[in-house]
Amino acid sequence: MSKGHSLQDPYLNVLRKERVPVSIYLVNGIKLQGQVESFDQFVVLLKNTVSQMVYKHAISTVVPSRAVRVPLLNEAGGAEGEEDEQAE
């Protein structure tokens, strides 16, 4: 995992695993709502009544509906290795 993704991937992974409803604001101001179904280096799959593939470069802000705890990289069972669990 590159340094640029050391927070992004664990954060999205917690949102995905805990099925936290999120609001995603795009750079053009559009608000999307749903749950993070999956993600990779370039896109986030957002599920609501339909699944939408949203390109990360178009995302301005991700707002969860509740507080989430992101594991630190040095914690046991932390973000390292959880990347493989994205396709549930």
UniProtKB/Swiss-Prot annotation:
**Keyword Protein biosynthesis included in the entry's annotation:** no
Give the record's keywords alphabetically: RNA-binding, Stress response
Looking up PROSITE patterns in the UniProt record yields:
SM
- Tell me one Pfam family matched here: Hfq
Its Gene Ontology cellular component terms are: cytosol
SUPFAM superfamilies (alphabetical): Sm-like ribonucleoproteins
GO molecular function terms attached to this record: RNA binding
Can you give the residue ranges of the Sm domain? 9-68
InterPro entries in the cross-refs: Hfq (IPR005001), LSM_dom_sf (IPR010920), Sm (IPR047575)
GO BP: regulation of DNA-templated transcription; regulation of RNA stability; regulation of translation, ncRNA-mediated
State the PANTHER family in the record: RNA-BINDING PROTEIN HFQ
Q: Which family does it belong to?
A: Belongs to the Hfq family.
Q: How does it assemble?
A: Homohexamer.
Q: What does this protein do?
A: RNA chaperone that binds small regulatory RNA (sRNAs) and mRNAs to facilitate mRNA translational regulation in response to envelope stress, environmental stress and changes in metabolite concentrations. Also binds with high specificity to tRNAs.
| Protein name according to UniProt | RNA-binding protein Hfq
The source organism is Cellvibrio japonicus (strain Ueda107)
Lineage at the top is: Bacteria, Pseudomonadati, Pseudomonadota, Gammaproteobacteria, Cellvibrionales
